[in-house]
From Swiss-Prot:
Superkingdom: Archaea
GO MF annotation, one: translation elongation factor activity
Protein name: Elongation factor 1-beta
Species of the source: Ignicoccus hospitalis (strain KIN4/I / DSM 18386 / JCM 14125)
HAMAP family in the cross-refs: EF1_beta
Secretion signal span: none
Protein family membership: Belongs to the EF-1-beta/EF-1-delta family.
Length: 94
């Protein structure tokens, strides 16, 4: 049996305002992810002056053409997202 290899991508997702509902953003991110991608967990991280960002942990297929580019585009397309920064990428298998 061949193990399916995925990568774990940790990304910082910045909201467009302090008032943005981060739980709603998480739900929209889940709905927006393509087949084969999975939001494993997320954290709210304080930035400054009441602004929080989302740190999202997404599993995606390793053999994705363009690497994390597709994921970045999907995340940037979610309502309320102003910026996306890929923090780390780790290979995982299960």
């Amino acid at each position: 049996m061949v193990a399916m290899v995925k990568v774990l991508v940790v990304a910082k997702v910045y909201p467009d305002s302090v008032e943005r509902n981060l739980e709603e953003m998480v739900e929209n991110i889940k709905k927006s992810l393509p087949e084969g991608y999975e939001l494993l967990q997320y954290q709210k991280v304080p930035v400054a002056f009441g602004l929080n960002l989302l740190k999202v942990y997404v599993a995606m297929p390793e053999e994705t053409e363009g690497g994390t580019e597709k994921l970045e585009e999907v995340l940037k397309g979610v309502e309320g997202v102003s910026e996306v920064e890929i923090e780390t990428v780790h290979r995982m298998s299960y």
